[in-house]
């Protein structure tokens, strides 16, 4: 991973694709627009581009609710334009890193739709809980956005945890099958030629065993039970050992 430590002194230019240059004339920024501005970006003296989410998404949270981790949203030009940008950036000596968002997915992701139907092996891909014996929510955690962190699912007849929007169910990273999925996502993009990832809310991926109530925090209730959780370092080391160490890449944690 970064054998020559090329990433130590790099300057990255962040691109929020929707607000960048509109290349196809539909009024929204896209990868064609990025491609057309690669010389300009290089002229700024930067060493690489960091893309905010480009994946297919219903758009409940500006693209951070991902419905497919192995594609590029059609509205941004799809995979064809992404490959052109990647090749063009590399030809100009610039690296390309992407956002990696694996604390949660969109509720429209295939995994979640199968999980709520209890279809193996996806049954425990997310954090599902029944109500407490007294009829209350599984715990008293708050969502980072608003309201409580639990949403009832009529189909499964259980609650699912969402630390962010209701449409962003949290993945169950304690499930080794989920961690394997993450590793396959990493391999997919690294094999394509991406140079690394900015890991979004990565400190939230491990929740305290038992998901206990939070009796101390009056605001952001529950955060001490999932921020820098018990297995964060263990899981990140697993991703590094099994995938990242086999590529010349970089990861940056939020």
Show which residues each predicted segment covers.
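Acidic/aromatic-lined carbohydrate-recognition and catalytic surfaces
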Residues: 2-187, 191, 204-254
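Hydrophobic residues within beta-strands of alpha/beta enzymes
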Residues: 49, 197-199
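Conserved protein kinase catalytic-loop anchor
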Residues: 194
């Amino acid at each position: 991973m970064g054998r020559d430590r090329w990433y130590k002194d790099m300057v990255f230019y962040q691109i929020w694709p929707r607000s960048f240059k509109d290349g196809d004339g539909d009024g929204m920024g896209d990868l064609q627009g990025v491609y057309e501005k690669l010389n300009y970006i290089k002229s700024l003296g930067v060493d690489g581009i960091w893309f905010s989410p480009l994946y297919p998404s219903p758009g409940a949270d500006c693209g951070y609710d991902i419905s497919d981790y192995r594609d590029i949203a059609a509205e941004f030009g799809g995979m064809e334009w992404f490959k052109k940008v990647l090749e063009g950036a590399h030809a100009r000596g610039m690296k390309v890193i992407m956002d990696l968002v694996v604390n949660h997915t969109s509720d429209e992701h295939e995994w979640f739709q199968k999980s709520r139907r209890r279809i193996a092996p996806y049954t425990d891909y997310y954090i599902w809980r029944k109500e407490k014996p007294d009829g209350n929510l599984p715990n008293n955690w708050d969502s980072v956005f608003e309201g409580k962190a639990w949403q009832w699912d009529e189909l499964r007849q259980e609650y699912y945890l969402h630390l962010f929007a209701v449409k962003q169910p949290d993945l169950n990273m304690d499930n080794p099958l989920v961690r394997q999925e993450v590793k396959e996502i990493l391999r997919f993009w690294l094999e394509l030629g991406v140079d690394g990832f900015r890991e979004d809310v990565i400190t939230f991926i491990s929740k305290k065993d038992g998901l206990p109530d939070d009796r101390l925090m009056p605001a952001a209730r529950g955060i001490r039970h999932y921020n820098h959780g018990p297995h964060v370092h263990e899981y990140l080391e697993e991703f590094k050992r099994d995938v990242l160490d086999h590529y010349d890449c970089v990861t940056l944690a939020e």
